[in-house]
Amino acid sequence: MIEPDTKDWTWVLDEVCPDCGYAAPEVDPAGIGATIRDNAQGWLAVLAQPGATERPDPATWSPLEYACHVRDVNRKFTERLHLMLDQDDPHFENWDQDATALASRYDLQDPAVVGPELAEAAETVASLYDDLAHAGEQTRSRRGFRSDGAAFTVDSLGRYHLHDLVHHAHDVRDFVARATVAAYDGDAAAYRDGTWELNDGVRAELDWFAGAVGPGGAVLEIGSAGGRDALALEERGLRVRRTDVTPAFVELMRSQGHEADLLDPLTDELGGPHDGVWASACLLHVAREDLPLVLTRLAGATRPGGALGMSLKEGDGEGWSTHGHVRAPRRFTYWREEPLRAALAEAGWRVEQLTHGVGGNGQEWIVTRAVRC
């Protein structure tokens, strides 16, 4: 049985949410609409996954039920924004989300229907936030009152609304990860063929890594994909354990005569101690709150003095993207130098060099050379 949520969540307007990491004071009002659209794209991907209608336990909503709630949240906040813009100091009718879930039978709704409904509701409210992004202070300070007396301005309502969406995406983060794996699964061969050529930047990192590991060194490769980098490392005299979280990539490598393991660095046994870990352009799919643990686990599987070669996309926040050789959306986490350095140090890595670069499509990257402390 689902336990009703009776908490007053207005504190998230002033404090960082310890569960999902949402920081309302840092939200740029001009970006709320785009974030809501990105959130909706994620729910479409989640609802397409097998098992999305199943509850992980009797007391927790299924991804489908969360999606129904997010759809209705977007509709409700559209309604409340219009009230605040059209009336002076309106009072919102009480909305019991748990009663709504039961009355509407969220558990029996069709994901193929809920997804488009959620996307439509998201676009409607996102467009409204877009229109308000550059509104004057008088408009942004218009007030509305919840039935319990809690007061919101147009500005604070948007920040409060966004937390609800971010938090529930966090609630189904396992399905978010599955959706990204499924995207690669669907286009594994196309991705391998389209990314097979090494560029000069990657060659330079491979050369450094091979020198740091030493001849004959044992390497754990995370995210081997089609096996391009593993071959390059072997050509440089290293022994490589090929791994990937995507089943289709593992099958591709095995079909080419290589041993390869299906492995999730967040949860699976890593073996070791290895002389080095190569993780090029793969840990960018790891959720922000999970990367410190992954880095710690990789350090634990590496001998002292062993090397880490890693590259991540540079930027802020997270987002879904459909680009390149993979047709379905994938979830990316973007990093800045300072928090990345802190995560590496806390995990037991000493940064030897951290450089910033720009890829062929204009994407900024952070490339890290580190050594196990």
Predicted regions and their residues:
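Conserved acidic residues
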Residues: 275
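Acidic/histidine-rich alpha-helical segments that form the ligand environment
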Residues: 38-39, 43-47, 100-142, 161
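A glycine-rich, hydrophobic loop/mini-helix early in the fold
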Residues: 34-61
